Amino acid sequence: MNKDEFLDYHKNCCDYLVDLTRKKNKDYSGNNDNPFFNYESTERLNVTSTEKGFLVRMLDKYNRINSFIEQGVFEVEDEKIEDTLLDLANYSIMMSAYIKHKKNK
């Protein structure tokens, strides 16, 4: 893969994540206009802060990646390592947006 191919791949991943986020946000938040509604549920339930809720989800993904590295396969065959890595990238972007949103309140 050369640099241009990498940049095309990166752009395609980002475009895919925007579309996936739009769909999942609707699934998890319904018609609620708050993109962080689902993540803030950890605070509404007095479990932990929203930021730590993001971290828990990210740790789940890290653990899944670590398991894949150690075992070389996933038991759930319809989810690939690329899906898990993209999920992790998406959680990072969402947490970054949440922190920016909270700072600007």
Name what the model sees in each region.
Residues 1-105:
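Intrinsically disordered, low-complexity regulatory regions
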